[in-house]
Structure formats: C-alpha cells, structure tokens
C-alpha cells in the first residue's frame, strides 16, 4: 500500500477471526491492513449459505464499483447518470431510469441464500469457539504422535477462525504414503483431505517455473493432511479420529 498498490485480503477461511499486531485487535474483514477483504460462504465454510460470498471495504469508491459490478454494471443513482437527456424529464429524474455504464456480472445472491447466511452469522462466535475447543482436544491427543505428526496449532496475535485443522505428517518416517493413509482412515469412517495443491502445479497456472522456485509451498504440500473439524463434532468424534490415525500409522 505504501507503493500505491491495492491490497486484497483473502479471508475466505478466516471469518470470525481477529488480528492483533500489538497496536490493537481488529476483526478479520475490518480491512485494517488491506483495501478489501473477500469471504466465502460455500457449504463447507464456517458461515454457509449454499453458495456465495461477500467483500468488505472501507473505501467508498471501491464499494460503489463493486455494487455496480455485482449487478450487470447497473447504476441507479441520478448523480452518476451519463445520458442526462434520457434520465430526466422537465428537470426531474424519470423514476424508471437506470444506466449500464460498464460491463458487470450477475453476482447477486438470492434472498433465500442471504436469509440462510444471516442466520448462520448469528451463530458465528459460538461456532468459532466450539471449533477452538475441538482443536485443543486434537492438540492434546496428537501430542504423543510427534514427531511423525505435527499439527498446525495455536498461533499468537489474535483469534484463529479454525476453518480447517491441518496436520503435517512425515509419511516417509511413518512408512505409509498419504494416499494409503487416507484410504485407511476412510475404512474407519474418517474423512480426510489435502488443502491445497499448490497453484503452480495446476496446468492453468504453469509458466515453466521449476518446483524448486516454490520450496515452501512444496514442503507444506508434501506433508499436509486435513483432519475433520466441524461444529457438529463431539469430543468422542475427535478421539475416534486420532485413534484411527494412530492405528493407521
């Protein structure tokens, strides 16, 4: 931002979290360090509305542009009309008039989706708190599996939203591949996933750069495994996940 660039915050996993940089605590989405923050309300997210999302910003100009672009570029504010001769009659704005001043999109969420999302927002703090409780149980139960299993746990500087619970696993030391471990967990009724495959490995983003150019991403990717974490989990569910993981290793 010091260089005049816009900073867009990817907050898709972070709703309900906070940032504490020592000079005060701010909610994720308050845009204390960014120009805009984007959230996802996909079915597996902490706030789920079927499909959709939201963008927050403190920039009124940016907010106005986004409001127009989400609905076909339509402008209904008289002070922004370009074709004033069509917009007015006898000095008064025609009540039906609107303009499309730029090509936009249909990014409008339905009223039904929004109603679902609003009801989920009312439970956000409770949801984040429960996720944090489940993570603490995970961390305690996984401790004996170190150093083969090292969960990405607590961090300082604010409240983590805990959309995902990721463990770094030394598959070579365990003598099992990630695929075989996931299959073994599935046989025990435990789902697991990999979040995520680095973008530079995707054909759409490959530019000829060697994997060595992204050693951090590859080091994380080769060892990461997401374990179940959702509000409906019980303490016993977490115990079963860890028990199944230990048996598979």
Residue ranges and their predicted role:
Residues 1-24, 58-61:
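Catalytic PLP-binding core of fold-type I/II PLP enzymes
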Residues 6, 18, 35-36, 191:
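Proline-centered loop/turn at the N-terminus of a beta-strand
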Residues 18, 22, 58-249:
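PLP-dependent aminotransferase class I/II
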Residues 49-55:
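Glycine-rich phosphate-binding loop of ATP-grasp-fold ATP-dependent ligases
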């Amino acid at each position: 931002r010091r260089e005049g660039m816009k900073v867009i915050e990817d907050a898709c996993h972070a709703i309900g979290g906070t940032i504490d940089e020592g000079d005060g605590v701010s909610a994720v989405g308050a845009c204390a360090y960014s120009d805009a923050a984007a959230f996802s309300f996909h079915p597996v997210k902490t706030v789920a509305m079927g499909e959709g999302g939201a963008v927050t910003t403190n920039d009124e100009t940016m907010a106005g542009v986004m409001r127009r672009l989400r609905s076909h570029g339509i402008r209904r504010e008289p002070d922004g009309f370009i074709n004033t001769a069509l917009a007015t009659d006898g000095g008064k704005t025609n009540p039906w008039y609107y303009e499309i001043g730029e090509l936009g999109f249909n990014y409008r969420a339905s009223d039904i989706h929004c109603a679902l999302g609003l009801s989920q927002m009312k439970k956000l703090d409770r949801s984040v708190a429960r996720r944090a409780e489940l993570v603490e149980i995970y961390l305690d139960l996984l401790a004996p599996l170190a150093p083969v299993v090292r969960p990405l746990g607590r961090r300082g500087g604010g409240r983590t939203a805990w959309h995902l619970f990721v463990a770094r696993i030394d598959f070579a030391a365990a003598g099992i591949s990630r695929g075989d471990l996931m299959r073994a967990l599935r046989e025990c009724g435990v789902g697991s996933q990999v979040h995520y495959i680095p973008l530079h490995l995707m054909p759409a983003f490959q530019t000829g750069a060697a994997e060595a150019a992204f050693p951090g991403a590859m080091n994380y990717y080769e060892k990461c495994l997401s374990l179940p974490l959702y509000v409906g989990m019980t303490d016993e569910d977490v115990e079963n996940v860890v028990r199944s993981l230990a048996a598979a290793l």
